[in-house]
Amino acid sequence: MTPLFAPVPHRLGLYPVVDSVEWVTRLLDAGVRTLQLRIKDKTDAEVETDIAAAIALGQRYHARLFINDYWRLAIKHQAYGVHLGQEDLETADPDAIRRAGLRLGVSTHDDMEIDVALAVRPSYIALGHVFPTQTKQMPSAPQGLAQLAAHVKRLGDYPTVAIGGISLERAPAVLETGVGSIAVVSAITQAPDWRGATQRLLELAGVGDE
């Protein structure tokens, strides 16, 4: 099966998920070329201001910037892509996202949710959470490396992203499963030396294919 939405490279490389325009700026300056803006707890006006600014930055750096959840604003400001959770799929309009030419990523946590994602045929499928994580309340147990590898094998050539509790130390084992990309949060944003952590993760995962 191939994506119905605009395609992404099979390898998106290092894929940080951050919550501010400041982090988007830092990481683009540091050489990251795939990232996601996940905004929480802001007013509608602040959300739109931040999304518009982040998208403009992404375009300036020719980066793959995904907007989490706010698909209407992503379309309005012409983002590279949108990332939706399973619950977001129920309220979003995937056809509108596809018609606008945006890429779509979808979160999954088990085989049933992978089935749901495949029915939509997004640009990539996120597989998580691999390890315990403190950055987001999760309703399910961690998958672990064996289950991640099984999902990657099932999906074959479909672009995949691993997410959830992936640290610098765990990243090599995650990449050995064959997953196309690794999404990280605290491995960068909570690192004592975020710039050094970013460079080491880029050395492991790369910036992604063109």
UniProtKB/Swiss-Prot annotation:
4-amino-2-methyl-5-(diphosphooxymethyl)pyrimidine binds at Q36, L37, R38, I39, K40, N68, S107, K136. Keywords: Magnesium, Metal-binding, Thiamine biosynthesis, Transferase. It comes from the Bacteria. The keyword Coiled coil does not apply. Its cofactor is Mg(2+). GO terms for cellular component: cytoplasm. Binds 1 Mg(2+) ion per subunit. It holds the Pfam family TMP-TENI. It is an enzyme of class 2 (transferase). SUPFAM superfamilies: Thiamin phosphate synthase. Mg(2+) binds at D69, D88. InterPro entries: Aldolase_TIM, ThiamineP_synth_sf, ThiamineP_synth_TenI, TMP_synthase. Pathway: Cofactor biosynthesis; thiamine diphosphate biosynthesis; thiamine phosphate from 4-amino-2-methyl-5-diphosphomethylpyrimidine and 4-methyl-5-(2-phosphoethyl)-thiazole: step 1/1. Its EC number is 2.5.1.3. Condenses 4-methyl-5-(beta-hydroxyethyl)thiazole monophosphate (THZ-P) and 2-methyl-4-amino-5-hydroxymethyl pyrimidine pyrophosphate (HMP-PP) to form thiamine monophosphate (TMP). PANTHER family: THIAMINE-PHOSPHATE PYROPHOSPHORYLASE (PTHR20857), THIAMINE-PHOSPHATE SYNTHASE (PTHR20857:SF15). Belongs to the thiamine-phosphate synthase family. This is Thiamine-phosphate synthase. The lineage of its organism: Bacteria, Pseudomonadati, Pseudomonadota, Gammaproteobacteria, Enterobacterales. The gene is thiE.
